[in-house]
């Protein structure tokens, strides 16, 4: 009987030793090359699969989003204004009077919401963004409220939007 137990112990020792020998080592974390100098005031490099922050420079700094605001404006317009895409858009003096890059809206210009979205996203038209907001939101203020609600719903809880085009005060 003792011989059988000895054989089992020896077999288990060899078996577990072999098993330990055959188990591959855990993978090493990736090694990234040093980051090049970043000229931006703030930057974040995130792993898109895991959400892990790989590198950052002033990543928590609140900054103006500039024309990236128009992306949120476009998302809301496509989600909430889909039925209005081919309808004539609202063009007000507020839209016409926007500073910066514009598509040249005029009050007598028939233009669809669909065309405004192109003008807003391809030309970065600030006037187009305001007209999109007034057409989709029913009012300028109503659309700004929609923007802030959407931002919270997608996790941008530290964001606050004051206009649909990203112009600073």
Per-segment meaning from a language model:
Residues 1-2, 113:
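Structural motif marking the loop-to-transmembrane transition
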Residues 2-20:
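Sec-dependent N-terminal signal peptides of Gram-positive bacterial secreted proteins and lipoproteins
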Residues 21-169:
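Active-site-adjacent loops and short helices of periplasmic peptidoglycan-processing enzymes
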């Amino acid at each position: 009987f003792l011989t059988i137990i000895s054989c089992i112990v020896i077999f288990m020792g060899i078996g577990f030793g072999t098993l330990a020998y055959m188990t591959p080592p855990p993978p090493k974390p990736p090694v990234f090359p040093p980051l090049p100098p970043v000229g931006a005031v703030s930057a974040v490099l995130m792993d898109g699969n895991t959400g892990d922050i790989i590198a950052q420079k002033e990543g928590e700094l609140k900054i103006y989003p500039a024309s990236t605001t128009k992306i949120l404006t476009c998302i809301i317009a496509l989600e909430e204004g889909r039925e209005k895409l081919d309808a004539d858009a609202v063009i007000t003096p507020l839209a016409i009077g926007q500073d910066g890059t514009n598509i040249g809206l005029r009050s007598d210009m028939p233009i669809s919401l669909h065309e405004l979205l192109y003008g807003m996203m391809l030309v970065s038209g600030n006037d187009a963004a305001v007209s999109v907001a007034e057409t989709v939101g029913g009012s300028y203020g109503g659309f700004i409220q929609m923007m802030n609600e959407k931002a919270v719903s997608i996790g941008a809880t530290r964001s606050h939007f004051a206009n649909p085009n990203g112009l600073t005060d």
